[in-house]
UniProtKB/Swiss-Prot annotation:
Residues 43-125, 165-175, 213-217, 266-273, 324-362, 409-412, 504-752 are lumenal. Despite low primary sequence conservation between eukaryotic catalytic subunits and bacterial and archaeal single subunit OSTs (ssOST), structural comparison revealed several common motifs at spatially equivalent positions, like the DXD motif 1 on the external loop 1 and the DXD motif 2 on the external loop 2 involved in binding of the metal ion cofactor and the carboxamide group of the acceptor asparagine, the conserved Glu residue of the TIXE/SVSE motif on the external loop 5 involved in catalysis, as well as the WWDYG and the DK/MI motifs in the globular domain that define the binding pocket for the +2 Ser/Thr of the acceptor sequon. One of its GO terms (biological process) is protein N-linked glycosylation via asparagine. This is Dolichyl-diphosphooligosaccharide--protein glycosyltransferase subunit stt3. A motif (DXD motif 2) lies at residues 173-175. The lineage of its organism: Eukaryota, Fungi, Dikarya, Ascomycota, Taphrinomycotina. The chain crosses the membrane at residues 22-42, 126-144, 147-164, 176-195, 198-212, 218-234, 240-265, 274-293, 303-323, 363-385, 392-408, 413-434, 483-503. It holds the Pfam family STT3-PglB_core.
Length: 752
């Protein structure tokens, strides 16, 4: 009676727990979402509401066109102010999801009589979506283990620096909403596979369509889900639920994605989409085989069917290779192919290799972005192997692919972070479950019930019951062990929170257009040279001014200065970029015809030698040389820019080719004026300034910012008398020297 009363009371406690667990989970999720949003607002508080980096400036400019001119004009937008004189079909060559999302939010807020600027919507979009990402991660992780695991994963995802780096306020890039859609699509996919519901499969397809509109990384989902299905088929786990989920997702998702202008017919004509199509066909064969298998019981017929299936799969593979070799199916693009052949971009497409985000990461950068979670990834994967349900197989595949791609390209730590957070949550929740339960009282009750049950059994049955009763919970009952493990885990979690907050605040919340440095007294000094230069361009040059710069700054010039650019961050035309690189690396007399041919009015360069800014153009110079050498190997030779010892020198030991190049002259022209005589120093390259000031003949300095970071040079017009500009410059300098010459005391002035 006592045992039954205890069990009844425990049931009452459990039912009471269910009543308060749901609102508690909702409250915790709200707190996680608020923490996710607030931790990304450092840049707005410390600086102001401003767009960061480079690509976001184009997205912001496109969003303004969308809300000002409407969706139809946005889709048909031809940008004549970029890639001069070619222009760019912007509306058909971008992923519109980010801009459409901002536009809808902007319109809804105005309908609600909330007057906001489109810039503020763009700045705060990424933090807002980070809260939704945490909730989506919760729903995905809870399918693996429990609600506690989901809450841990959501908390990790909300503040992990690997995700924060692309979702702080002002980071208005495609990834701002793409990771949210990635996790939401995966969560719905697992839901569809477990339920076998065509509704959830359709929802997965619609979210996949949203993802396609938002980010080129949708190809990761395109290949991830088919790979999951393929592995399940190899494991012999074909079910009608799997068939319904994938076919519904694939048909709706593919047809919807083909409505995006930039994607078009790629889902049925490019190599990176063929795995999804192949698995779709394979599922139809499996469905047909299982249908026939249920109708016919003959062994020989089943063998024949299996043979036919193998032949069909082999034939499909041969046809795929044949279509790929003939060009009917487009091959992998350079950016995707470089994920498999890591040296491909460096050898064949240096423009891809020149982007710092496309370099492989270091161990320190992985720890910087994921802290102790990276060590828990293999633990979580191991625990998934122990259960190995369909959803666990998905996370295992995700972990393997995410780790590989992150190891190839540091930018893809963004796609690795979600699975690391989930795997770490599985590991920690399992650890805490082991050391925080089961309760000792519960175990005593179960032992008493088992002993009472065994008393009723006699002889051999009592012995067998001892060996077969495997329902006893295994836990850690030592209080010291529990306290040590739980306290150490809590310590690591607290340190993770401190680390994430520090990294977000100090490393990822500084806009690229505004720099800051700490002075000797501990105060912050802000360096606003970029906006100073762009503001000067906007105020002091005509609207149709053509500005040449390296492609990194094209979007910023168009967004802040509103001037015409030759190249920008879209990098769709390698020849045009190589032409700019050739002009920068050629001697002045050879660069001038290129400048005149492209109607260049001003040249913008970044020189970091004064401040010690290492991301200036002289440190990017080798990439300009390599890209232009790919098209003009006889005119531009990289070896000529290195000393006989193989050193990259910019001081007096620099090679003649280096000293005569246009970029070198523009960078070091007048730089010695900021230092005492013979003490000039290049802080970015840790070398002395050249002792002889480079002289310019075809261009002249127009503006240099206060910290000597951004420099603008005006291209001279041809001489009206047809004289060589070098001779004209030397002649003018000679006249100035004559005018400055002091008059002799015994010299009699001429009478006029």
């Amino acid at each position: 009676m006592a045992n039954s009363a205890t069990i009844t009371s425990k049931k009452g406690v459990k039912s009471h727990q269910k009543d308060w667990k749901i609102p508690l989970k909702v409250l915790i999720l709200i707190c996680i979402a608020v923490a996710s949003v607030s931790s990304r607002l450092f840049s707005v508080i410390r600086y102001e509401s401003i767009i960061h980096e480079f690509d976001p400036w184009f997205n912001f400019r496109a969003s303004k066109i969308l809300v000002e001119q409407g969706f139809y004009n946005f889709l048909n937008w031809f940008d004549e102010r970029s890639w001069y004189p070619l222009g760019r079909v912007a509306g058909g060559t971008l992923y519109p999801g980010l801009m459409v999302t901002s536009g809808i939010i902007f319109k809804v807020l105005h309908l609600l009589r909330i007057n906001v600027n489109i810039r503020d919507v763009c700045v705060l979009l990424a933090p807002a979506f980070s809260g939704i990402t945490a909730i989506a991660t919760y729903y995905l992780a809870r399918e693996l283990k429990s609600d506690a695991c989901g809450l841990l994963a959501a908390a990790f995802m909300g503040i992990a620096p690997g995700y924060t780096s692309r979702s702080v306020a002002g980071s208005y890039d495609n990834e701002a909403i793409a990771i949210t859609l990635l996790m939401s699509t995966f969560a719905l996919w697992i839901k569809a596979v477990k339920s076998g519901s065509s509704f959830w499969g359709a929802c997965t397809g619609l979210l996949y369509f949203y993802m396609v509109t938002a980010w080129g990384g949708y190809v990761f989902i395109t290949n991830m889900i088919p790979l999951h299905v393929f592995v399940l088929l190899l494991m012999g786990r074909y079910t009608s639920k799997l068939y319904i989920a994938y076919t519904t997702y694939y048909v709706i998702g593919t047809l919807a994605s083909m409505q995006v202008p930039f994607v078009g017919f790629q889902p049925v004509s490019t190599s990176e989409h063929m795995s999804a199509l192949g698995v779709f066909g394979l599922l139809q064969l499996f469905a047909f085989y299982n249908y026939v298998k249920g109708l016919v019981s003959s062994k020989q017929f089943q063998i024949l069917i299996r043979f036919a299936l193998v032949c069909l799969v082999g034939l499909a593979t041969v046809v795929l290779f044949a279509l790929s070799s003939t060009g009917v199916i487009a091959p992998w693009t350079g950016r995707f192919y470089s994920l498999w052949d890591t040296n491909y971009a460096k050898i064949h497409i240096p423009i891809i290799a020149s982007v710092s985000e496309h370099q492989p990461p270091t161990w320190s950068s992985l720890f910087f972005d994921l802290q102790f979670l990276i060590w828990l990834l293999p633990v979580g994967v191991y625990l998934c192997f122990k259960e190995l349900r369909n959803e666990h197989v998905f996370i295992i595949i995700y972990s393997v692919l995410g780790t590989y791609f992150c190891g190839v390209m540091v930018r893809l730590v963004l796609t690795l972070t979600p699975c690391v957070c989930i795997a770490a949550a599985v590991a920690i929740s399992t650890l805490l479950d082991t050391y925080m339960g089961p309760e000792v009282e519960e175990d005593k009750v179960s032992e008493e019930a088992a002993s009472a049950k065994s008393k009723n059994k006699k002889g051999i049955f009592s012995i067998l019951s001892f060996f077969t009763s495997g329902s006893k919970n295994i836990g850690i009952y030592s209080l010291l062990s529990r306290v040590l493990v739980i306290s150490s885990t809590a310590y690591f979690l607290i340190m993770f929170v401190y680390h994430s907050s520090w990294v977000t605040s100090n490393a990822y919340s500084s806009p690229t257009v505004v720099l800051s440095t700490v002075l000797n007294d501990g105060s912050l000094m802000y360096i606003d040279d970029f906006r100073e230069a762009y503001d000067w361009l906007r105020r002091n040059t005509p609207y149709d001014t053509k500005v040449m710069s390296w492609w990194d700054y094209g979007y910023q010039i168009a967004g802040m200065a509103d001037r015409i650019t030759l190249v920008d961050n879209n990098t769709w035309n390698n020849t045009h970029i190589a032409t700019v690189g050739k002009a920068m690396s050629s001697p002045e007399e050879k660069a001038y015809p290129i400048l005149r041919k492209h109607d260049v009015d001003y040249i913008l360069i970044i020189y970091g030698g004064t401040l010690g800014y290492s991301s200036d153009d002289m440190n990017k110079f080798l990439w300009m040389i390599r890209i232009s050498q790919g098209l003009w190997p006889d005119e531009i030779v990289e070896r000529n820019f290195f000393t006989p010892n193989g050193e990259y020198r910019t001081d007096d030991a620099a090679t003649p080719t280096m000293r005569e190049s246009l970029l070198y002259k523009m960078s070091y022209h007048g730089a010695w004026k900021l230092f005492p005589p013979n003490q000039g120093y290049d802080r970015a390259r840790n070398q002395k300034l050249p002792s002889k000031d480079p002289q310019l003949f075809t261009i002249e300095e127009a503006f240099t910012t206060v910290h000597h970071l951004v420099r603008l040079y005006k291209v001279k017009k041809p001489d009206t008398l047809g004289r060589d500009l070098k001779q004209v410059t030397l002649f003018e300098e000679g006249k100035r020297k004559k005018l400055r010459r002091p008059a002799k005391t015994n010299e009699i002035p001429l009478r006029v």
